[in-house]
């Protein structure tokens, strides 16, 4: 597993394939780079593909925080430059979707295109924000059941493969509590309309 270090944080990533434009896959909240493995395998047939574990996730270092979306963006921009990827297609899921959006806004010289897969909300409706705030408070208080319930009951369809649900739930619940709380606060603080307008 290759790593780079940015701002005293070791970041784990994987690279495969060749060809331009390169694709950078950006996972979601409390997930890791393995979530994009099928897509990485497919696009690596014709493109250079990079999948990374965002800071605080997977095999990357897990500093105390905070975890604003901009911190992930800075790490990804550094990775793009270090690997000399040129202008990339940034593909992000959930939290990774809004991270890809801000990457394009902050670093248009590094981004050829953006794909947002079921992104986190650009604007949280008040009732949703209230509910997510309560989940964050529960996580910080040591109660992980609301977090588990949120993942199991809001991130899947009723027809989802039960084994897949169990596997994803295991990975997401394994994320340290300080990461789960701080990363969600970063999502809530994201100014979607302002970033999208750029």
Where are these regions (language model features)?
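Short, conserved loop/helix-junction motifs that constitute active-site signature segments
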Residues: 43-44, 196-198
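Conserved acidic catalytic loop of the alpha/beta-hydrolase fold
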Residues: 70-88
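N-terminal cap/lid segment of alpha/beta-hydrolase-fold proteins
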Residues: 1-10
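Structural signature of beta-strand start/N-cap positions in the alpha/beta core
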Residues: 9, 22, 46-48, 84-89, ...
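Conserved alpha/beta-hydrolase catalytic His-Asp/Glu region
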Residues: 123-131, 141-197
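Hydrophobic alpha-helical packing elements
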Residues: 39, 72-75, 180
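Conserved hydrolase catalytic core segment
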Residues: 85-125
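Conserved HGGG/HGGXW glycine-rich cap/lid loop of the alpha/beta-hydrolase fold
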Residues: 9-65
């Amino acid at each position: 597993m290759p790593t780079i270090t940015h701002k005293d944080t070791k970041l784990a990533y994987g690279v495969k394939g060749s060809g331009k434009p390169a694709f950078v896959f950006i996972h979601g909240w409390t997930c890791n780079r393995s979530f994009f493995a099928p897509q990485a395998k497919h696009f690596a047939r014709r493109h250079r593909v990079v999948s990374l574990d965002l800071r605080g996730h997977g095999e990357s270092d897990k500093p105390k925080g905070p975890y604003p979306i901009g911190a992930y963006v800075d790490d990804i921009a550094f990775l793009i430059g270090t690997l000399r990827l040129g202008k990339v297609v940034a593909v992000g899921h959930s939290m990774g979707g809004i991270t890809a959006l801000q990457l394009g806004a902050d670093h248009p010289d590094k981004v050829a295109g953006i794909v947002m897969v079921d992104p986190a909300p650009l604007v949280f409706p008040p009732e949703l924000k209230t509910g997510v705030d309560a989940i964050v408070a529960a996580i910080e208080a040591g109660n992980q059941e609301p977090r588990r319930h949120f993942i199991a009951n809001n991130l899947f369809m009723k027809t989802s493969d039960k084994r897949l649900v169990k596997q994803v739930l295991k990975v997401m619940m394994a994320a340290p509590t300080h990461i789960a709380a701080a990363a969600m606060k970063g999502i809530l603080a994201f100014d979607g309309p302002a970033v999208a307008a750029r």
